[in-house]
Every structure is written in C-alpha cells, then in structure tokens.
Amino acid sequence: AAVSTTGEGNVNIELNGSNALKSGHSHAGLEKNNDGNLTIQDKDKDGSLNAKGGQDGAGIGGGSSGAGSDITITGGKVTARGGNYGAGIGGGAYGNGSDITVTGGEVTANSGNYGAGIGGGGWGNGNNISISGGKVTATGGTFAAGIGGGMHRDGNDITISGGEVSADGGRCGAGIGGGL
C-alpha cells in the first residue's frame, strides 16, 4: 500500500496541501489496518487527498479480502477510487465496508468495477454508513451500489441526516442500498 495504518489505537491524518497515494495490486491507496478508528481531517481547510487503490483494493480502506471499517472523514477534499472489485471508500475485494462516517469536507468516492462507491467491495456488504455533513458524491461500479453493498451484497443501516449527497449505482446496482 502507498500508506498503511497499523497498531491497536486510533489514527488521525491531518491533510495539509495536496496529497496523492497510488497503490499496486491487492492494496488500498490508504490502507486501514489499525484496530481503532481512522480519521481524515483538515483543520486548516487547505488540504486534499487523492487515494487510488490497485486491483482488488479500495481507494481508502481494505486491501484484497480486507474490510474497510471505522473510517471517519471530517474535512478536506478527499477523492478515493478503488481498483476493480474494491470500493472507493470501504472494503477491498470480498471485504465489507462498515462504520464509515462523513461529517464534513468534499468527498468523491468511485469504484473501478464491482465495488460500491462507499461501502463494500465486490462480494462485500456495506453496513452502518452515516453522512451528516459535507458534499458527498459516490458512484458504484458495475452491479454495485453508490452507497452500500458491492456486487451481490447488501447495504444496511445507511443514514443521511445532513450535507449534500449524490449516490449513483453502477449498472443494476442501487444508488443507496444493495448491489445486484
């Protein structure tokens, strides 16, 4: 992975200036491997992150067969693109995307193919996804939801209580909900 978080605690990433991460096969651009929460923030309001996963990896979240969970975005301009089978933000191939929260910032999340924009990778569920602020654009890959489940999987407990949200599923996938 271009950057991988590890350990038992929480990880906070403060965005300053322009940042780009691109990973190779089976890895997320920003790969979350720590047990605690991963928070992406931009207190100075001048930061951006462009994270691109390789084949089977999420843009931000899990690598191949890895879950993308406990991810919070509070600010910044964040663009996340998963590789084929990976979510933009959430699970890698076969990985669930759960406990994902957006409270602010400008977030664009796209899957290469078969993963959700925000939620599960291909064959991964998207659970407990909450958006309460910011501007969020989420586009799922073929057969996957914009926000929710990847290909052949479900989207559950998705809450939108604020912000501006655009969610488009790929071919045969829901905008918000499950994949084909």
Report residues per predicted region.
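A composition-driven surface/loop motif
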Residues: A1-L180
